[in-house]
């Protein structure tokens, strides 16, 4: 194959990336390792905290990022999926990548692909995104990078890094077609990110998954820090109290809503404290407290409208939906009208999710809808009419805003891609 010289590409970087979305994600690391070698292994230029989990990855990374920023450390974060634009996936100190940096870094990866495809197939979309993140963080000279796993861990594209620490936020049933049909099988995939002799922070894992993590951790001689064992969190009237073997910290307020976010906060804080201790870095207690009070994470219990209140939450699997329902039950006062607008992808357990919402929130009005994404559920998936279905979410929201009282709440939940679609309506 004849290589194209620099500047001869017929596509822009964005067009090239869009074209690569048609290629299925490859589960294997050889091609990615070759690519990073061509890019001079930028992932070796900074310490990395590698984060996996069924749910809670993004929120945990958001809190970790805030903790590092408030300590004055330059932190990069790679997250997925993006809610508005590709650049949302790449963050430095919480700020999204500029269009200029996107073009420059994307072009570097595209040039490397020209050499790569002499022996390998073209890169997949997620391989490009991961490579761009690792190059970007090196160019910006971050002091620490937070890397979110795409799916699983063991064979995930991100698992070519030699991380300083690993984190598992949670383990539940999701992506069974790729990860396995039991919690043990899924745990094997997620513990695949563990590295020899590293510190590992484990969230609130089910017993079956925790047992796998302990076996793998022992095999790799990892220093395991487990929720409710090495560290814990307690909700009090004026915030919450975090405790581990070294310290006890009172946090007046957590800006992220939902009881489950307390567990994510505990994981983030334990990870942060271990990292700073390992590198013998000083810690400002007031900065820790402030970081939790200002942290935000788009699309996760995000209030996008007041009077009436409209809240977005990407509860994209049954495990996350249970946490969502728990929060809804705690919200508001008796008699307040709650409306749930839900959509998901057909490949998910959407019928089980709808049934769960109907069972657990019988007083709420449940509305199912579709959205512009290949594989989204449609009205034909509910032919009997037993579920209220609207074809277009945008007019529904517009009507809701004009007719609902200030005491009513609209919860919009389901697929993260649905949340992205809805968020564009509010963030114009």
Regions found by a protein language model. Name each.
Residues 116-117, 140-148, 163-251, 265, ...:
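Acidic, Mg2+-coordinating active-site environments of NTP-dependent enzymes
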């Amino acid at each position: 194959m004849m290589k194209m010289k620099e500047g001869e590409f017929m596509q822009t970087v964005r067009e090239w990336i869009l074209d690569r979305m048609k290629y299925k994600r490859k589960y294997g690391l050889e091609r990615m390792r070759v690519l990073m070698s061509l890019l001079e292994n930028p992932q070796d230029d900074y310490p990395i905290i590698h984060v996996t989990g069924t749910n809670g990855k993004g929120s945990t990374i958001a809190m970790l990022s805030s903790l590092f920023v408030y300590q004055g450390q330059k932190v990069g974060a790679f997250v997925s999926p993006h809610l508005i634009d590709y650049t949302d996936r790449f963050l430095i100190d919480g700020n999204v990548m500029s269009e200029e940096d996107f073009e420059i870094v994307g072009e570097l990866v595209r040039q490397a692909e020209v050499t790569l495809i002499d022996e390998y197939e073209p890169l997949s979309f997620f391989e490009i995104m991961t490579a761009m993140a690792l190059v970007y963080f090196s160019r910006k000279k971050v002091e620490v990078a937070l890397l979110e796993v795409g799916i699983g861990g063991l064979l995930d594209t991100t698992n070519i890094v030699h991380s300083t620490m690993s984190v598992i936020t949670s383990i539940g049933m999701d992506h069974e077609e790729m990860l396995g049909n039991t919690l043990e099988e899924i745990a094997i995939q997620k513990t695949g990110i563990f590295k020899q002799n590293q510190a590992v922070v484990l969230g609130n894992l089910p017993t079956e998954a925790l047992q796998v993590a302990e076996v793998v951790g022992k095999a790799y001689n990892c220093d395991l820090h487990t929720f409710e064992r090495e560290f814990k969190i307690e909700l009090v009237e004026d915030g919450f109290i975090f405790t581990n073997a070294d310290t006890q910290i009172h946090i007046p307020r957590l800006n992220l809503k939902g009881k489950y976010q307390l567990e994510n906060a505990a994981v983030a804080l334990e990870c942060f404290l271990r990292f700073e201790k390992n590198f013998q870095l000083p810690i400002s207690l007031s900065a820790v407290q402030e970081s939790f009070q200002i942290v935000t994470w788009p699309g996760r219990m995000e209030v996008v409208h007041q009077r009436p209140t409209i809240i977005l939450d990407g509860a994209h699997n049954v495990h996350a939906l249970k946490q969502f329902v728990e929060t809804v039950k705690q919200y508001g006062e008796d008699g307040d009208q709650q409306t749930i607008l839900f959509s998901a992808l057909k490949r998910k357990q959407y019928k089980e999710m709808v049934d769960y919402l109907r069972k657990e929130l019988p007083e709420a009005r449940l509305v199912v809808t579709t959205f512009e994404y290949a594989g989204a559920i449609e009205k034909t998936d509910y032919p009997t009419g037993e579920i209220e279905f609207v074809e277009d979410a945008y007019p529904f929201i517009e009507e809701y805003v004009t007719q609902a009282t200030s005491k009513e709440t609209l919860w919009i939940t389901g697929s993260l891609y649905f949340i992205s679609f809805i968020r564009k309506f509010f963030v114009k």
